[in-house]
UniProtKB/Swiss-Prot annotation:
Entry-linked PANTHER family: FHIP FAMILY PROTEIN CG3558, RAI16 PROTEIN-RELATED
Modified residues (Phosphoserine): 498, 805
One Pfam assignment: RAI16-like
Protein name listed in UniProt: FHIP family protein GG24907
Keyword Coiled coil appears in the UniProt entry: no
Assigned protein family: Belongs to the FHIP family.
Low complexity composition-biased segments: 925-945
Transmembrane segments: none
Source taxonomy: Eukaryota, Metazoa, Ecdysozoa, Arthropoda, Hexapoda
Keywords: Phosphoprotein
Ranges of compositional bias, category Polar residues: 855-877, 904-924, 957-966
Length: 1039
């Protein structure tokens, strides 16, 4: 019988330290319980004989005991497998026990005897300890919490855990210890009443061990110790699975602190976990590369694949994720302490100098690469953390004026918007896109609202319109009319009359041109997914409205949590009568001095409107106007702020903990630090208003944005994408002040820089002048549209390939490569694997995670995975490309142009390193109402938009982008491992035979691309203006 054989030959056959489960005994083996019990007792008898007769144990003695323990563990496993319920020793138990081996183990106190002997094994102690940990791991995993209640099991377990403190173990022993501690944390999480069993006085617990000479005496002043947590702390920054298991167990302990205040007190007051986490985070940050390799013209932020490819960044993100999770689940004392340490020990001393690039308080010239990397790391951090407490700490860091010699981080970031370096500019705009996506009141107040609240940028005659929305005002037509003339003409020629978009009548008739029977590119005549090609780039207006509605609603929900409403207020609430009288007196003095006569006698019978300045395009002379009573009462009744009596929103406390730890129903980090009663506004300060018009500044942020917008036609493609996306994100805010600045065509703006609408008019005039409506211009426009549409379909097909089988993946990749060889021979289509690491995955509803399929579109790929098409095609007509699109083969309509074979395409793929970027049409949340292409940007908040579609380039940020028409960046390329990107202009397209007959210059081709992007962006602004009007009119009716 196998039991008898194992009983007699166990030592000889199993003393080589083999794995626990590599035994002839199987847990599922059908066996006799009595035979198992006899064999178990026999093995212990032999092991105990060795223990008793070994003065100092020799190598053979230790090997023999370990072998017997291995068999005993296996027999216990067999017994527990056949027992439905663990039976523990009982004095009055009748009948045979259900688990006789386990009962013998506990009744004979075997675990304690084994521990006492292990303390005498000297250099073999680790081998014996490993077997002990295996035994405890097995018993805990199968008995769960039942054994923890019994002293014969708990006492030796606490002894072995206490003796493990401060010890350095080999990797296999560390692994077993962490696994056991993790199992104990899981059991305690399910049985909170057992927590007190693992709190013990170190002096009392170790006293017996001191008498036996086993351990050193405890330090003076030792207090209650949570032994499990103490043992896990050294492994918090470990790499690999060991570190993950340790951090998981520590998080369980943090969650337990919410249920047991003793644990919270111990961790906050007696453990070193908070300073250890913060110092480790700072150390990991210092190991990050000072310069990120940028091999792409459109790179603007760190993606999940970048995190995976940079080991130092992976470790840093693991530590940051852990800190974020601790703040989320820990006790309030631990949370406040960690936030305090984070701010004082990492954010200010580590991130501050890195972003400001300072050395000993003095600025020094540094290269652009280090600035780009520091800002990219900050952007990654802001997109990764989700806890309001941490977010508030970073917001305070951006606005702090005391820590950096009076200089604010936010001001330094705004200055970099004006950087001539395109990469630094794009990274800065991506960072501001993330900041605006936080919907934080303090940030918006510092960037925009504090410059707009006085209302001095609006002529006095128009200020009463800020809060009052005219339901009959059609701002959409205003933006659509700003489209360049060549784009209007191209739409008229490229689409039938029956389209979803309303027809905009042109005031100036365009020159008549012959309508081509068939466009030379696929982008003008093919009907994709039920939407005409002319509306594939220029998406269905319903898609724009759907996107705008969802974005505005999301922003409105967050802004409702703000402390102030930020509606322009005509009269102050306090001292209203005195201010009114003082204003009238100033007006009388003004007329008596400059008007040449007294005020009319009938002024007492009517309400007089204050001084105003005429519309921005007029001569600027000031006049007076009589306003109806209902307008004044409307302006008077609008409220600026709610009451300031809520204690949870009092942000004037001087302590950091009170600022960082504000909690309640509102998200404190979104709420302003400013006292709401201090924001009392008036526009009747005649001493400044009447003589300062035209010199009002909108702040450095808007000035920088308008400055970049004025150079729209000379910017690179990707800078314009981020620029338009940033302005679009501002337009989503349902605040009357911002709405009046960006979307109201009936309100003039008087500031020291051209207004937004004036800049748009200038851009239209510039494009109309340099790109007149000619056949050559229309052909270049057609190519520009088609190239963007073409790239979107390549990305869409690559994504479908990633979602399917490997065979489908390969076929799809080859199909799109063949289909679009003509328009993008220099842009290889490469499907890329998904990243295993996703630091942006969240369960928080405010920060949606990025899907694996979308992430795969942005992952990098080596050259070995790219495919070379067997046959190249150089289609010169839309029909040939349509045929290739559906078949993946070269078109038979190409004729002599088929000489451009696959070898040429392969060479272009290897030499030109270009980034795949494209446009798609997609409604929000995958809705089919728009009939558009179902692709979306891999973005969590970065929406570099061009018109109805949030055009994004490899965007990864804090909210998921559901865009109507999105410009993606596919990070493919050669074996260098870097991003590849396409040229900013259409030179590569123009060099192909498709527009060989075009006589346009490089400047005209760049202007054509700008015209396409501007036309798309204006349609998005039109949709946002319409939706914002609906939202504000509805809100106005509810007041």
């Amino acid at each position: 019988m196998w039991l008898r054989q194992s009983s007699g030959g166990g030592v000889a056959s199993a003393g080589h330290g083999g794995p626990l489960r590599q035994r002839p005994i199987d847990a599922a083996t059908d066996c006799d319980p009595r035979a198992c019990y006899d064999s178990f007792c026999k093995h212990w008898q032999q092991a105990f004989e060795i223990i008793q007769h070994s003065a100092p144990p020799s190598h053979d003695d230790v090997l023999g005991v370990v072998s017997h323990l291995d068999y005993m563990v296996t027999l216990l496993l067999v017994e527990l497998h056949h027992c439905n319920k663990v039976s523990l020793p009982a004095a009055e138990a009748s009948g045979p026990p259900a688990a006789p081996c386990l009962e013998f183990l506990l009744s004979e106190n075997l675990l304690d005897k084994l521990y006492e002997w292990a303390c005498t094994t000297g250099r073999y102690a680790n081998a014996v300890r490993l077997e002990q940990l295996k035994l405890y791991e097995l018993l805990v995993s199968h008995s769960r919490h039942q054994l923890l209640c019994h002293e014969p099991f708990l006492r030796p377990l606490l002894k072995i855990l206490a003796s493990s403190q401060g010890e350095i173990f080999p990797p296999d022993l560390e692994k077993r210890l962490v696994i056991l501690l993790n199992q104990l944390c899981v059991v305690l999480m399910q049985n909170v009443h057992l927590l007190d069993l693992f709190f013990f006085s170190a002096q009392t617990q170790v006293q017996e061990q001191i008498l036996n000479g086993n351990v050193a005496p405890p330090k003076s002043g030792t207090t209650t110790n949570f032994i499990i947590f103490s043992l896990l702390i050294p492994y918090v920054h470990r790499e690999g699975s060991l570190g993950h298991q340790a951090r998981d167990a520590l998080l369980l302990c943090m969650a337990l602190s919410q249920k047991n205040s003793n644990i919270g007190t111990y961790i906050a007051q007696y453990s070193s976990i908070c300073p250890l986490l913060v110092t480790g985070l700072g150390g990991l940050y210092s190991r990050l590369p000072n310069s990120i390799e940028i091999s792409s013209i459109d790179w603007h932020r760190i993606t999940p694949d970048d995190v995976t490819e940079i080991p130092e960044l992976t470790l840093f993100m693991n530590a940051l994720e852990f800190c974020n999770a601790v703040v989320q689940v820990a006790h309030e004392m631990i949370k406040q302490q960690l936030l305090d340490f984070m701010y004082q020990g990492f954010i200010v001393p580590v991130l501050g100098p890195a972003i400001l690039q300072t050395l000993k308080g003095k600025h020094f010239q540094t290269n652009i690469d280090s600035q780009i990397s520091a800002m990219s790391y900050l952007d990654l951090i802001l997109r990764s953390i989700t806890e309001p407490g941490l977010l508030r700490a970073f917001v305070r860091f951006l606005l702090d004026t005391e820590k950096f010699d009076g200089e604010r981080i936010l001001d330094a970031l705004v200055e970099r918007l004006n950087s001539p370096d395109a990469n630094l500019c794009m990274v800065t705009m991506a960072l501001f896109d993330t900041l605006l996506g936080l919907h934080c009141e303090d940030l918006m107040l510092e960037l925009l609202l504090k410059f707009m609240l006085p209302g001095k940028h609006v002529p006095i005659s128009h200020r009463h319109k800020i809060n009052k929305i005219d339901p009959y005002l059609n701002s959409s037509e205003f933006f659509l009319d700003l489209s360049p003339d060549v784009m209007k003409r191209a739409r008229d020629l490229a689409r039938p009359k029956s389209v979803h978009e309303p027809v905009v009548s042109d005031l100036t008739p365009l020159p008549s041109l012959p309508s081509p029977v068939m466009s030379k590119t696929i982008g003008a005549n093919w009907n994709y997914y039920g939407v005409h090609t002319g509306d594939s780039l220029y998406a269905n207006i319903q898609a724009y409205l759907f996107e705008a509605h969802w974005r505005i609603a999301q922003c409105q929900r967050d802004c409702l949590k703000w402390a102030n409403s930020y509606r322009y207020q005509k009269w102050p609430r306090h001292g209203q009568g005195r201010v009114h009288a003082h204003a009238l007196e100033l007006a009388r003095q003004f007329f008596s001095e400059f008007g040449g006569g007294p005020i009319a006698a009938n002024e007492t019978g009517e309400k007089q409107l204050d001084s105003l300045q005429s519309i921005g395009e007029s001569s600027g002379y000031e006049s007076f106007k009589w306003r109806p009573a209902d307008e004044e009462s409307e302006a008077t009744d609008t409220t600026l702020a709610t009451t300031a009596s809520e204690a949870d929103l009092d942000h004037n406390s001087s302590s950091l903990s009170s600022v960082l730890g504000a909690s309640g129903k509102r998200e404190a980090w979104r709420t302003s630090n400013n006292n709401r009663n201090e924001l009392i506004l008036t526009d009747l300060d005649f001493s400044e208003d009447l003589f300062a018009q035209g010199t009002v500044s909108l702040g450095p942020f808007l000035n920088a944005i308008w400055g970049k917008l004025q150079t729209f036609t000379s910017n690179s493609l990707y800078v314009n994408l981020h620029l338009t996306g940033l302005i679009t994100r501002l337009a989503w805010y349902p605040l009357p002040l911002i709405h009046s600045l960006l979307l109201r065509s009936d309100i003039a703006i008087t500031s020291d820089t051209p207004s937004f609408h004036q800049v748009l008019r200038i851009l239209k005039q510039q494009i109309d002048a340099e790109l007149p409506v000619t056949e050559d211009s229309l052909e270049i426009i057609d190519v520009a549209r088609s190239s963007l549409i073409d790239r979107e379909f390549r990305l869409a097909n690559a994504r479908k390939g990633n979602e399917g089988s490997p065979m489908h993946h390969s076929q799809q990749q080859q199909m799109v490569t063949n289909s679009y060889a003509t328009l993008s021979a220099a842009t290889p289509v490469q499907a890329t694997p998904t990243s295993a690491y996703d630091p942006f995955k969240r369960s928080d509803k405010k920060r949606r995670s990025i899907s694996k399929s979308i992430t795969s579109m942005f992952s990098r790929k080596s050259a070995s995975t790219s495919t070379t098409p067997p046959n190249g095609s150089s289609a010169s007509s839309g029909l040939s490309q349509i045929y290739a699109f559906f078949t993946g083969a070269a078109s038979n309509l190409v004729g002599n142009n088929a000489s451009n074979d696959g070898r040429g395409i392969s060479q272009a793929q290897t030499s030109a390193g270009t980034c795949e970027t494209s446009l798609s049409t997609q409604p929000q949340a995958g809705a089919s109402r728009t009939g558009a292409t179902a692709t979306s940007a891999a973005a969590s908040g970065s929406n570099s938009s061009i018109a109805g579609s949030t055009l994004t380039l490899s965007a990864q940020s804090n909210t998921t982008t559901h865009s109507a028409s999105t410009l993606h960046g596919l990070d493919g390329g050669p074996s260098t491992g870097g991003f590849n990107s396409e040229p900013a202009s259409l030179d590569s397209v123009a060099s192909m035979g498709i527009i060989a007959s075009t006589s346009g210059t490089e400047r005209s081709r760049d202007l054509a691309l700008c015209a396409v992007l501007m036309d798309e962006w204006l349609k998005e602004l039109a949709a946002i203006a319409q939706e914002q009007s609906v939202v504000l009119v509805t809100e106005q009716g509810s007041l």
